[in-house]
């Protein structure tokens, strides 16, 4: 279960309020969406959960535990903006992502090869990211 209590986040030295006393409970096994206009704080909240940025105030709990770095491995996040390096090969990009997640290069290689085999996309390994469609690039981020 995800529980957020009175989460607030500001930018520009407090001049821009992204979230103000935001609270939500998401029961285990459920699917929720965050809806709202631009600037409503949806992305800020997702980034706080993923520990990309920190809340100014409030608390977040995952299964009753205060949010901590150990939760990162259990949280998925695919940002709308692309975090891909177009001149890298698909394989190199995935190894880089694995290292960002704390995996050894060998373990990242093993996992990437496993999933390439499962998804039958072995032929993508040496392709440049710039050669992929937006949809295919999104799969690489996943």
Give each language-model segment a name.
Residues 128-135:
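Conserved ABC ATPase signature
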Residues 33, 47, 137-142:
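ABC ATPase nucleotide-binding domain "signature" region
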Residues 95, 99, 107-124:
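Conserved ABC ATPase "signature" region
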Residues 50:
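Helix-to-loop junction immediately C-terminal to a conserved catalytic motif
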Residues 58-73:
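Conserved ABC transporter NBD signature motif
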Residues 1-4, 8-21, 28:
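A short, flexible loop at the N-terminus of ABC-type nucleotide-binding domains that lies
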Residues 37-41:
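Walker A (P-loop) phosphate-binding loop of ABC-type ATPase nucleotide-binding domains
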């Amino acid at each position: 279960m995800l529980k957020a209590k009175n989460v607030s986040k500001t930018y520009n030295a407090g001049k821009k309020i992204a979230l103000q006393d935001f609270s939500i409970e998401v029961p285990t096994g459920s699917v929720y969406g965050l809806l709202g206009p631009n600037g409503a704080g949806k992305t800020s909240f997702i980034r706080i959960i993923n520990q990309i940025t920190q809340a100014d105030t409030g608390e977040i709990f995952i299964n009753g535990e205060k949010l901590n770095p150990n939760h990162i491995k259990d949280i998925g996040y695919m940002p709308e903006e692309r975090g891909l390096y177009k001149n890298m090969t698909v394989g190199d990009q995935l190894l880089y992502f694995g290292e960002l997640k704390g995996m050894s290069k060998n373990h990242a290689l093993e996992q990437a090869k496993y999933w390439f085999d499962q998804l039958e996309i072995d032929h993508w390994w040496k392709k440049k990211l710039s050669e992929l469609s937006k949809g295919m690039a999104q799969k690489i981020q996943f």
